[in-house]
């Protein structure tokens, strides 16, 4: 029997020829001997052979016609279903006879593209040697059918209830409002980046390069300094109004009267050019028109028309901002991003006010005792959580405080700290910035050798703790040799650090989760305390006196939270008071 077929022959044709060869094979093999025994005449034999061959051919033809008729009915039903309303025949519910079809999940029939992909993947998984042109044509027919189903509109695949749900979701004012606020926050982030980049470029690049970057936003007739100043002023004014708008509305749905007063909350000047832009925006319906209208509105916003002022009365802040513009306020490290300030100028202005407030606070002996005791209790609580004896720390801490309170050592201490970059002898610059914030930054990027020891699973926890403490002591010992004053303030600080640094390092970097949680809570409370101190909404920058009162209130509240978490008794009885009578000489205005 011949099972080979030509390259251009289809599967059906090859099957038909194979079946047609069966009678010939039977006749040549068995027919001659069997028919010879029957002793039929040659004519009768030919009639029987022709009858058998015709029967086989007729059966094959009937089967082929039946398949074509079934395909024609299916195509007609599909076309008619799409015309009438639209559900294709393949999606209509049909009777499922096999158990395999009943076990099909609905997720498999939700997407027609998944069907076509499964079909094509099944065809492509066949052996390539068994493919013929007919198989390729069959695959192409399946692909075309599936692609035509995919190309059909989404309506037939979705019920009217789903359409109504989507329309209600898209037209829901609350969802649209929340989406708009998310985009608004993204725009705020971009504006902040633009302002920070512009300020850094002005401080790090020549004026000619800054002019090239800001040339598109500034008028051609102005000088380089005025161009950068006007552009920065525009950005500051825009950010200020945007922050006010964001705080006023937030992410929740505002009341109707607040939405009606949206125009007033922006506080944009209603000039004639803006009225024309508003009328243009009302007539436009595309996002491109809105985008260009917003760009033109930003160009019409002038620095002289919208001054950069805080929402609350902040006379002290405004005076400090003037000093910042004249370059009279300096710092060791800019903490703009960490403390959530608008820009570097905003940070410097608030820093100047905070310095003056701490000077007012520390004029009172009770406040000096309060801040010194709070710091001691916090570190003691951390060491107790780490199961360490705080006796050595307490002795060195008291000795450092006695040295710092001696007025005859201030000149030496100032010279030491100036060599470390501290530009102001203030509690904030020394205790909060130089000691605490630098310690947190150092712990965020430890040496690779220390990390290798801590991440070694074959070493015990006690060995890791001992190795980390030895590394800290070695670093402090090497730094002691480089001190300009062997028995100065830095030397006393290193004596305290010998007891505290290993505990903090093992707490932040070590494998003990409970100790790590305690150290992270301690860090977060300190950082949030500083953020509240530099927030115009949390403290009053109207006068130095009011700012000092708010900082003392923040210090009491944060110390109660942190000491309560560490299980240490609070120091309420040592809370001092803010001096009422202060002179301008004391404030260094």
Swiss-Prot record:
Subunit relationships: Homodimer and heterodimer; forms heterodimers with miga1.
Residue ranges, annotated region (Disordered): 87-134
UniProt keyword terms in alphabetical order: Membrane, Mitochondrion, Mitochondrion outer membrane, Transmembrane, Transmembrane helix
Lineage: Eukaryota, Metazoa, Chordata, Craniata, Vertebrata
GO molecular function: protein heterodimerization activity; protein homodimerization activity
Protein's job: Regulator of mitochondrial fusion: acts by forming homo- and heterodimers at the mitochondrial outer membrane and facilitating the formation of pld6/MitoPLD dimers. May act by regulating phospholipid metabolism via pld6/MitoPLD.
Pfam families linked to this entry: Miga (PF10265)
Transmembrane segment boundaries: 11-31, 42-62
Predominant location: mitochondrion
Gene Ontology biological-process entries: mitochondrial fusion
Cellular component GO terms held in the UniProt record: mitochondrial outer membrane; plasma membrane
Subcellular localization: Mitochondrion outer membrane
The keyword Membrane is annotated on this UniProt entry: yes
Membrane-related topology note: Multi-pass membrane protein
Biased composition (Low complexity): 106-116, 123-134
Family membership noted in the UniProt record: Belongs to the mitoguardin family.
Protein name: Mitoguardin 2
């Amino acid at each position: 029997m011949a099972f080979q077929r030509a390259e251009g022959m289809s599967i059906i044709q090859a099957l038909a020829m194979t079946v047609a060869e069966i009678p010939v094979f039977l006749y040549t093999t068995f027919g001659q001997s069997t028919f010879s025994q029957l002793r039929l005449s040659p004519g009768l034999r030919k009639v029987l052979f022709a009858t058998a061959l015709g029967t086989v051919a007729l059966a094959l033809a009937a089967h082929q016609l039946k398949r074509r008729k079934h395909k024609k009915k299916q195509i007609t039903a599909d076309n008619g279903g799409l015309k009438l309303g639209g559900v294709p025949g393949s999606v209509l519910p049909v009777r499922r006879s096999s158990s395999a079809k009943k076990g099909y999940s609905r997720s498999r029939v939700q997407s027609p593209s998944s069907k076509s992909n499964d079909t094509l993947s099944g065809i492509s998984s066949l052996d390539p040697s068994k493919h013929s042109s007919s198989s390729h044509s069959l695959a192409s027919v399946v692909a075309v059918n599936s692609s035509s189903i995919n190309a059909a509109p989404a309506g037939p695949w979705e019920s009217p209830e789903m359409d109504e749900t989507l329309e209600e979701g898209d037209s829901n004012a609350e969802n649209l409002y929340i989406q708009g606020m998310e985009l608004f926050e993204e725009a705020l982030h971009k504006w902040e980046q633009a302002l920070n980049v512009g300020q850094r470029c002005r401080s790090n690049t020549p004026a000619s390069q800054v002019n090239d970057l800001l040339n598109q936003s500034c008028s051609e007739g102005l000088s380089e300094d005025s161009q950068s100043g006007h552009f920065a002023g525009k950005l500051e004014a825009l950010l200020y109004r945007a922050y006010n708008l964001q705080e006023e509305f937030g992410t929740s749905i505002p009341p109707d009267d607040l939405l009606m007063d949206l125009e007033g909350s922006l506080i944009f000047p209603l000039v004639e050019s803006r009225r024309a832009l508003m009328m243009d925006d009302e007539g436009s319906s595309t996002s491109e028109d809105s985008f260009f209208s917003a760009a033109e509105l930003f160009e019409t916003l002038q620095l002289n028309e919208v001054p950069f002022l805080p929402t609350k009365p902040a006379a002290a802040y405004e005076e400090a901002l003037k000093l910042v513009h004249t370059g009279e306020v300096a710092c060791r490290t800019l903490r703009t991003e960490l403390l959530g300030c608008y820009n570097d100028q905003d940070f410097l202005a608030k820093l100047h006010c905070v310095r003056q407030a701490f000077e007012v606070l520390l004029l009172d002996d009770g406040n000096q005792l309060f801040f010194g005791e709070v710091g001691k209790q916090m570190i003691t609580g951390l060491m107790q959580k780490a199961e360490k004896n705080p006796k050595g720390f307490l002795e060195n801490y008291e000795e450092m405080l006695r040295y710092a309170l001696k007025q005859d050592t201030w000149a030496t201490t100032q010279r030491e700290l100036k060599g470390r970059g501290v530009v102001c002898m203030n509690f904030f610059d020394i205790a909060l910035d130089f000691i605490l914030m630098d310690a947190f930054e150092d712990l965020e990027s430890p040496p690779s050798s220390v990390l290798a020891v801590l991440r070694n699973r074959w070493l015990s926890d006690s060995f890791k703790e001992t190795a980390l403490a030895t590394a800290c002591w070695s670093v402090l010992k090497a730094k002691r040799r480089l001190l300009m004053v062997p028995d100065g303030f830095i030397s006393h600080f290193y004596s305290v650090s010998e007891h505290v640094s290993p505990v903090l390092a093992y707490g932040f970097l070590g494998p003990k989760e409970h100790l790590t949680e305690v150290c992270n809570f301690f860090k977060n409370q300190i950082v949030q305390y500083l953020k509240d101190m530099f927030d115009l909404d949390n403290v009053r920058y109207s006068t130095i006196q009011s700012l000092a009162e708010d900082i003392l209130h923040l210090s009491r509240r944060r110390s109660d939270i942190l000491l309560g978490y560490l299980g240490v008794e609070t120091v309420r009885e040592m809370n001092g008071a803010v001096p009422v009578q202060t002179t301008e000489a004391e404030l260094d205005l």
